[in-house]
Amino acid sequence: MTKASRAQGAANRPRLAPVAPASLRETAYRSLCEAFNTGQFAPGDTLTLQMLADQLGISLTPVREAVRRLVAEGALIDTPSRTLIVPKFDRQRMEELKSARLALEGLVLDRAMARSTPEWIVALEATLRTSDAAGHKGPDLRQNHAFHFTLYNHADSEVLLPMVQALWLQYGTYLNLIMKHPQVGRIADHIFHYAIIEALRRGDRDGARAALAHDIERSFRVLAPDP
């Protein structure tokens, strides 16, 4: 392998945050989840435990346990050769993910609105101000995740929230494709997020659900435009 090819390979690796020594299993899992949720992995990527351990700067054991959880949640596919595969892009899979997100996240939003407080709405606004101040071009994936889970965590649902989190781990690889799409610069980052907040202020459940549905559908439409 030439120096140029090694350099290219390093450039294409996902950016994973190094892991502190304490609580390695949970920290490795959370670091990998963040990478999935922010589009660091693309559909069809092939990974190994050793590669992930090297990126995280830890031993294989905590990475193996973190990966086992991600396989169970559908974010990774384990193979007999011990190679890990990120599920490939597939139109049917994408449609199922969209339908699941629309249904489950709508339910979680309903529960969150039933517990609505002024402080919660202020916290939602703060996630958008942080993103706006950062001056990102195109969608800010970390702040997008922060907004949605500030919204959903308020529901305090032990049943629904883990299901939504698992859906986002699977959806996150599509964000990788969206960020590379020629239309990404045309995406208005928070237009539907602000619409959700305004609906929350009014106590408008239907308006909030409609804005959330538009937000979810828009990202999938980039990858599979309507005929």
Locations of the language-model features?
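Short linear motifs at protein or domain termini
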Residues: 1-114, 224-227
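A short secondary-structure junction motif
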Residues: 35, 39, 167-178, 219-222, ...
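Mobile beta-alpha loop/short-helix "lid" or hinge segments that flank ligand
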Residues: 72-77, 167-170, 186
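A ubiquitous short alpha-helical element
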Residues: 90-94, 109-113, 132-135, 176-183
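C-terminal all-alpha effector/ligand-binding and dimerization domain
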Residues: 2-9, 20, 128, 177-227
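Short, flexible turn/loop "capping" segments at secondary-structure junctions
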Residues: 45, 78, 144, 188-190
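Conserved amphipathic alpha-helical segments that form helical-bundle/coiled-coil interaction surfaces
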Residues: 115-176, 191-199, 207-218
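Short, flexible helix/strand-to-coil boundary loops that buttress conserved ligand/catalytic motifs
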Residues: 80, 90, 98, 164, ...
